[in-house]
Amino acid sequence: MNPEEQIVTWLISLGVLESPKKTICDPEEFLKSSLKNGVVLCKLINRLMPGSVEKFCLDPQTEADCINNINDFLKGCATLQVEIFDPDDLYSGVNFSKVLSTLLAVNKATEDQLSERPCGRSSSLSAANTSQTNPQGAVSSTVSGLQRQSKTVEMTENGSHQLIVKARFNFKQTNEDELSVCKGDIIYVTRVEEGGWWEGTLNGRTGWFPSNYVREIKSSERPLSPKAVKGFETAPLTKNYYTVVLQNILDTEKEYAKELQSLLVTYLRPLQSNNNLSTVEVTSLLGNFEEVCTFQQTLCQALEECSKFPENQHKVGGCLLSLMPHFKSMYLAYCANHPSAVNVLTQHSDELEQFMENQGASSPGILILTTNLSKPFMRLEKYVTLLQELERHMEDTHPDHQDILKAIVAFKTLMGQCQDLRKRKQLELQILSEPIQAWEGEDIKNLGNVIFMSQVMVQYGACEEKEERYLMLFSNVLIMLSASPRMSGFIYQGKIPIAGTVVTRLDEIEGNDCTFEITGNTVERIVVHCNNNQDFQEWLEQLNRLIRGPASCSSLSKTSSSSCSAHSSFSSTGQPRGPLEPPQIIKPWSLSCLRPAPPLRPSAALGYKERMSYILKESSKSPKTMKKFLHKRKTERKPSEEEYVIRKSTAALEEDAQILKVIEAYCTSANFQQGHGSSTRKDSIPQVLLPEEEKLIIEETRSNGQTIMEEKSLVDTVYALKDEVRELKQENKRMKQCLEEELKSRRDLEKLVRRLLKQTDECIRGESSSKTSILP
């Protein structure tokens, strides 16, 4: 083993240098990069001689900070009487051999002096340090330090530079820099201080713990790890604590399952017979907690079975991946119900607190219930950390290594999904429980369960401006809401009946990722932009399922072409068709659509001809009558043999041909009427639209005053006119509001002026009367 490898192994064994996950190809370059800022060196000298460096820069950003750290290390090395190097040798990396020589000498000196180190020296360092921070208690601290330090020396002389202790009692942290430990935990001490507090590392986390809560581990009890190896006897640079970490996973999993079972048996099951809560409230509070509890016990047993095999045959990652579908179903369901449970806890906090305390819980009982119901979320977050720690101490060639990596990704994804679902359900509960501004129709609570909800950006018609909306999907209707200006509530923006709608994907068009549009007979063209692909797929799936249901009349279109056909005005009060009405199938328009279908009865042919003659007379007066007639004749009818014979007559065919010509002429002239008509009808859009190939020449004035001629299709022109009408209405509304405010201000000003004039007049009269009384 060359000197560079020896130094790396030594630093890792002392815990001052993080163990690399991969094999080191060039130990010298690894050492240069690791030691350059001086942080590792300061930790090293503090580990070998506690208190040598009181303060150093943990995150050096400049060259001066790095040089200062290196100088602090060299000052500590001066007491060891070893040859030191120049700080620039390390920072520049030029004479790195001198740095290696110094580190080797430090290692040799500390090994030789370890068994001969006097207690008085260490205690004097500690006492001096204490006297600086607390001069009044320096004497007492020195005496106690002498007694405690002698025991510390005995513990550190146990064949290793690393002090390893085992917890005798449970300790729960009260500050962020403290370390929570359970009885039996193995702790690697990183710093020994006076006052009864030591710093140590447990499961990758470093913090302070009381020294009288632990005991020293003898050499025979220590786990096989780099920190238990003396000197340079271990060649591999990637030693780990795989067995210790795995055992910690098993222990914490057992404890977690035990806590869930205790909460279920002691509190939740007796709560079901409590009369203070209704059955619905108890169900909302419990959710699927019992299923989660049962699943965790199954998981605990499965992990124990995996750990019984030899280490090179462990399949912890494979076990977790096989149970991942159950993880998702259990925890997603629990997260979806948790906002409802919190709502019950808030509404019945007094009753639940009294119940918990009657069951033996310490005061406040509601806090224990709230904390325990949140433990599944905290445990889900810990899975990622535990698996990352296990993977860190696992060889790349281990058969379970790839599964561990996949499990880490799966748990991260699940954790993100659970967080998003909780936020979404919490927002959903807020909307359902609070009044909605400008709401129309029946109460939102009567619409049933919310199938899906998310925040999206929408575009109406041909308008390019995007508006933020919250879409809530129910079984029969899609509700659109917007947030109030101060985010204090929600404003009703309309509803879209599911029946009669068409959903078209637009994600295949470049620039329209996660985008779809909604059209239909009672729906204005609405383009929906989702925030992410997951919401996009969920919307398509749920809308597709409802539209293709037995009561629906449309299908999901996956074409990404310009969908301009069959666009009608959006109405917030539009009603879906009745159950007995025929389905309205949207087809491309052509002149063949105008050909009349045969009547159901032969006798209806004569009545049909009479009605047609009357309609032809009326059509010259009002084209609207003809449009209504065309709209009613969309229903398909099945021909019969008798009808076929009647239709074969020459007179009937000639009359039908004349009627068809009249209708075709009417529809052809619709283009001229739409382009040069007096005005656009207010609340309706033509039911029969000409093909997109027919264009109109529109004269448009830009904002800069420039007038241009632009060619637009009939559909685009109609929607552009509709948008202009809507903007004019909004502008008119704003002008009315401004006018009302102006009138109100004028009235207030008039009242103020009158009041001031009145006061002035009274003052003048008072002064004149006083002068009159003074005169003789």
Curated annotation (Swiss-Prot):
It is found in: Cell projection, Lamellipodium. Residues 160-219 form the SH3 domain. Residues 115-151, 561-581 are annotated as: Disordered. Residues 561-572 have a biased composition (Low complexity). Residues 121-151 have a biased composition (Polar residues). The modification Phosphothreonine is found at residue 133. It comes from the Eukaryota. PROSITE patterns: CH, DH_2, PH_DOMAIN, SH3. The modification Phosphoserine is found at residues 126, 144, 150, 225, 488, 640, 684. Pfam families: betaPIX_CC, CH, PH, RhoGEF, RhoGEF67_u1, RhoGEF67_u2, SH3_2. Its main location: other. Interacts with PAK kinases through the SH3 domain. Interacts with GIT1. Component of cytoplasmic complexes, which also contain PXN, GIT1 and PAK1. Interacts with PARVB. Interacts with BIN2. Identified in a complex with BIN2 and GIT2. Interacts with PARVG; the guanine nucleotide exchange factor activity of ARHGEF6 is essential for PARVG-induced enhancement of cell spreading. Acts as a RAC1 guanine nucleotide exchange factor (GEF). PANTHER family: RHO GUANINE NUCLEOTIDE EXCHANGE FACTOR 6, RHO-TYPE GUANINE NUCLEOTIDE EXCHANGE FACTOR, ISOFORM F. This is Rho guanine nucleotide exchange factor 6. It comes from Homo sapiens. The gene is ARHGEF6.
